[in-house]
UniProtKB/Swiss-Prot annotation:
Subcellular location: Cytoplasm
Listed InterPro entries: Chap_CCT_alpha (IPR012715), Chaperone_TCP-1 (IPR017998), Chaperonin_TCP-1_CS (IPR002194), Cpn60/GroEL/TCP-1 (IPR002423), GroEL-like_apical_dom_sf (IPR027409), GROEL-like_equatorial_sf (IPR027413), TCP-1-like_intermed_sf (IPR027410), TCP-1_chaperonin (IPR053374)
Name under which the protein is recorded: T-complex protein 1 subunit alpha
UniProt keyword terms in alphabetical order: ATP-binding, Chaperone, Cytoplasm, Nucleotide-binding
GO terms assigned for molecular function: ATP binding; ATP hydrolysis activity; ATP-dependent protein folding chaperone; unfolded protein binding
Name of the encoding gene: tcp1
GO cellular component: chaperonin-containing T-complex; phagocytic vesicle
Subunit structure: Heterooligomeric complex of about 850 to 900 kDa that forms two stacked rings, 12 to 16 nm in diameter.
Family per record: Belongs to the TCP-1 chaperonin family.
CDD domains in UniProt: TCP1_alpha
Species name: Dictyostelium discoideum (Social amoeba)
Gene3D superfamilies named among the record's database cross-references: GroEL, GroEL-like equatorial domain, TCP-1-like chaperonin intermediate domain
Classification via SUPFAM superfamilies: GroEL apical domain-like (SSF52029), GroEL equatorial domain-like (SSF48592), GroEL-intermediate domain like (SSF54849)
Length: 548
C-alpha cells in the first residue's frame, strides 16, 4: 500500500528492504569494532567536534563516542553499554556476535525461511547453549588452584594497553578487590567496586602505579594553617557554598540611616559565622564540601582546629558518606526554615590525612571496619591514563563477577567452538525448518575464534578447523573429555588447553554475552516496516492543510 493511500506524511520502507538496511547498518558498526577484538586487537583514535582525543580498544567506549543516527545501529550501541554495565567486559564480543547472527538470519530470510521460524530457532539455540555452558563447560572456582583469580584479571587485561604489565596490575586489582570484600545482611559475599577509587596522576611510568588503603581524594586542605592529619575523624559532608551571604542581584534595600548599612554587613557576616559554629559545635573536625569555602570561613575553621576540604567531587563525597555512615547535606535549614546541624549526619572515620604521593597531595580517608581502597595510576600522558583506567575498571568488574558467581570457563574461543559443535548436533535431530536457524546460530558463534585469529594475522580457517576437530573429539570420545577446554593460543599459532594455560573468563560473562546478542538480533529481525515521518514545519511557516 503506498504512502498516498495511507496518507502518511513521511517515508515508508517495508519487507526485505528494511531488513537489508538494518543488517547493513549493524554490520557497519561491527566492522568498526571487530579489528579491536582480542589480545592482538588494534586501537581506535576518536576525535570529537571540539578536538578532544580518545585512544581505546574498548568496544563500549568506541561506540559511545561515535554519533550514530541509524535506529538499528543504536540498538547495538545500547547492547554494548548493557554488557559493560552488567559484566564490565565482552563488549566487543557481544556486538560482533549480534551482527553475525543478523547477517545469517537475513540470508535465511532470502532463502524463504520465515522470520518467526528463525526467531524461535535462535531462542531454542540460545537456551540450549546456556544450558550446555552451565552443565558441561563451566568449572567451579573451588576446584582450581589459588592463583586462578590472577589469571582471570590477566585475561581481561590481555587485549588492553596494560597487557605488557599485566602481572603487576593483576596483583593490584586482586588486592584492591580483596580489601573491599564485605558480607551483606543475607550472608552473601559482595565486592562493591564503588569502594575502589581510581585516580590518575600524570608522570612516571605505568609500573609506578600504587594501591593506597583508604579512599583517596584528589584534593588538598583549603588552608595551610589547618591540621594535615586528624585521628578519630568526625566528617561533615556538605553540598553547598560556605561563603559570606550576599543578597541576590536585583534586590533593593532602602536605608535611611548610615548605621543600618553597617548593621546589614555585620548580619551578613554573622549568618555565615552561625552556620560554621553549628557545624563545629556538632563535633565535626573534618569538613568536606563540593563547593567553595571563602577566606572568612577558613579563618573560623583554622581557629577551631578543623580540617576543611573544598571542591570535592560529588560522586566521591557520596561514596565516602556511605562508607562512613554520614549524610550529604544540601542545606542546614530544616522544614521550619531554621538552621541546625544534626549530629547523625556526621560520618566517622579512623583517620583523615593529607599525604604526598609523588608530585601530588591527596586526602585519604581511612576506615578499618568499612573497607575501601584507591588505585593511583601513573602514566606518560592523559590518553594512556584514560585507557589504563578503563582497563583497570573492566578487570575489577570481571574479577568481582567471577568471585560472586563462582564459575569460570576457558577463553580463546573455546566456549564458542564447543557450542558450535553441540548446536550443530542438536540441529541434526530437528525435523523442522528450525534446523536451519539453529545450524546458522552454531555457525555464527565461530565468528569469535575466527576474528581472534584474523586480528592476530594467523590463518583463521586452519586454526578454527583444528579447534572444531578438538571439540568434536571431546563431545564424541569420552577419553578426550579434557579437549572441551581447548582454545586458541594466538602467540604460538596453535590450539591448547586454555584451562591449564590460565586463559579464563567468568561463565556469567559468556552467558550474558550470548543472551544479549541473541535478544538484540531477534529485536532487529522482528522489524519488517520502517516509517520515518517528515519533521513538522515550524510555526509561522506554510499554513496550508491545517484545520482538516
Amino acid at each position: 500500500m503506498s504512502n498516498k493511500v495511507l496518507m502518511i506524511d513521511g517515508d515508508r520502507i517495508s519487507g526485505n528492504e528494511v531488513r537489508a538496511q538494518n543488517v547493513l547498518a549493524v554490520t557497519a558498526i561491527a566492522n568498526i569494532v571487530k579489528t579491536s577484538f582480542g589480545p592482538i586487537g588494534l586501537d581506535k583514535m576518536l576525535i570529537d567536534n571540539i578536538g578532544s582525543i580518545v585512544v581505546t580498544n574498548d568496544g563500549a567506549t568506541i561506540l559511545q563516542k561515535i554519533d550514530i543516527e541509524h535506529p538499528a545501529a543504536k540498538i547495538l550501541v545500547q547492547l554494548s553499554e548493557l554488557q559493560d554495565q552488567e559484566v564490565g567486559d565482552g563488549t566487543t564480543t557481544v556486538v560482533i556476535l549480534a551482527a553475525e547472527l543478523l547477517k545469517r538470519a537475513n540470508e535465511l530470510v532470502a532463502r524463504k525461511v520465515h522470520p518467526t521460524v528463525i526467531i524461535s530457532g535462535f531462542r531454542l539455540a540460545c537456551t540450549e547453549a546456556i544450558k550446555y555452558i552451565n552443565e558441561t563447560l563451566a568449572v567451579k572456582v573451588e576446584t582450581l588452584p589459588k592463583d586462578f583469580i590472577v589469571n582471570i584479571a590477566k585475561t581481561s587485561m590481555s587485549s588492553k594497553t596494560i597487557n605488557d604489565d599485566s602481572d603487576f596490575f593483576s596483583k593490584i586489582v586482586i588486592e584492591a578487590i580483596t580489601r573491599v570484600k564485605t558480607i551483606d545482611y543475607k550472608g552473601d559475599v559482595k565486592y562493591p567496586i564503588n569502594a575502589i577509587n581510581i585516580l590518575k596522576a600524570h608522570g612516571k611510568s605505568a609500573k609506578e602505579s600504587t594501591l593506597v588503603e583508604g579512599y583517596a581524594l584528589n584534593c588538598t586542605v583549603a588552608s595551610e594553617g589547618m591540621p594535615k592529619r586528624i585521628q578519630g575523624a568526625k566528617i561533615a559532608f556538605l553540598d553547598f557554598n560556605l561563603a559570606k551571604t550576599k543578597m541576590k542581584l536585583g534586590q533593593k534595600v532602602v536605608v535611611t540611616n548610615v548605621n543600618d548599612l553597617e548593621a546589614i554587613r555585620d548580619r551578613e557576616n554573622d549568618i555565615v559565622k552561625e552556620r560554621i559554629s553549628l557545624i563545629i559545635k556538632s563535633g565535626a573536625n573534618v569538613v568536606l564540601t563540593t563547593k567553595g569555602i571563602d577566606d572568612l570561613c577558613l579563618k573560623y575553621f583554622v581557629e577551631a582546629g578543623c580540617m576543611a576540604v573544598r571542591r570535592c567531587k560529588k560522586e566521591d563525597l557520596k561514596r565516602i558518606a556511605k562508607s562512613c555512615g554520614g549524610t550529604v547535606l544540601i542545606t542546614l535549614a530544616n522544614l521550619e526554615g531554621e538552621e541546625s546541624f544534626d549530629t547523625t549526619a556526621l560520618g566517622i572515620a579512623d583517620e583523615v590525612v593529607q599525604d604526598r604521593l609523588a608530585d601530588d597531595e591527596l586526602i585519604i580517608v581511612k576506615n578499618s571496619n568499612k573497607k575501601s581502597a584507591s588505585i593511583i595510576l601513573r602514566g606518560a600522558n592523559e590518553l594512556m591514563l584514560d585507557e589504563m583506567e578503563r582497563s583497570i575498571h573492566d578487570s575489577l568488574c570481571i574479577v568481582k563477577r567471577t568471585l560472586e558467581s563462582g564459575t569460570i570457563v576457558p577463553g580463546g574461543g573455546a566456549v564458542e567452538s564447543a557450542l558450535s559443535i553441540y548446536l550443530d548436533n542438536i540441529a541434526a535431530t530437528m525435523g523442522s525448518r528450525k534446523q536451519l536457524a539453529i545450524s546458522e546460530f552454531a555457525e555464527s558463534l565461530l565468528v569469535v575464534p575466527k576474528q581472534l585469529a584474523v586480528n592476530a594475522a594467523l590463518d583463521a580457517s586452519d586454526l578454527v578447523s583444528k579447534l572444531k576437530a578438538y571439540h568434536h573429539a571431546a563431545q564424541t570420545d569420552p577419553s578426550k573429555k579434557s579437549y572441551a577446554y581447548s582454545g586458541l593460543d594466538l602467540f604460538n599459532n596453535k590450539v591448547r588447553n586454555n584451562l591449564e594455560a590460565g586463559v579464563l573468563e567468568p561463565a556469567i560473562a559468556k552467558i550474558k554475552c550470548i543472551k544479549f546478542a541473541t535478544e538484540s538480533a531477534i529485536t532487529i529481525l522482528r522489524i519488517d516496516d520502517k516509517i520515518t515521518l517528515n519533521p513538522r514545519e515550524q510555526q509561522g511557516g506554510d499554513h496550508e492543510g491545517h484545520g482538516h
